[in-house]
Amino acid sequence: MALLTPFLPCFMVAMKRSRNIVILTGAGISAESGIDTFRSAGGLWEQHRVEDVATPEAFARDPDLVLRFYDMRREAIQTKEPNPAHLALARLDREWPKRDGGQVLIVTQNVDDLHERGGALNVLHMHGEHLNAWCLACDSRPRWTGTLIDRPPCPVCSEPALRPDIVWFGEVPYRMDEIYEAVAAADLFVSIGTSGAVYPAAGLVRTARELGLQTLELNLERSQGSAWFDETRLGPASEIVPAWVDELLG
């Protein structure tokens, strides 16, 4: 188990006295489970430019390419397993409310289900989920583990109008009002495995600081928003996240 550089005593006390915690997770937490990040691939996803597979315009221009791409990603994600960072956050999610009735909310930018499979219950997907589809005819979002390339009928309305339930570039992330309300009610904001480059998620730490929350960054390397955090600890998520959870619950 990795040992974290000791926190300032006043910050450690403030963390332990927190009641509600909001944790933002990004691609870095799932990378160690074998899910490639867009930025680590030199601006390519499976050799595709983001403009070709992750925008509404791309879907309108070449829906077959987009559907094949997401079918491949959906299949691949189902072969991956949660790593120690996911398991540690699930433990925190279970045990923290027992202390003072507080709550942990995991707000993830990731579209995999590794937090849930790791045992976390309070997870909010702001960028959608690979294992959901979105029907453009009836606006339902059914669970979906198969393929979409053959235009299967929606299980709700029977129309062949399903697309990936993913927030593409240029679209509005999901449940932002809930996220801001949770940050406003929290005492501690933690960012794990994020680049600090994708908004509005990247702006949450600034909101947290302006509201007076304690802020902590756990990342492989410093992010574009590191200056906004009270404390930063660097290292692989699978090592530093369990170490932090051990300290917080200890």
Task: Report the location of each language-model feature.
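Conserved catalytic core of sirtuin-type NAD+-dependent deacylases
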Residues: 2-250
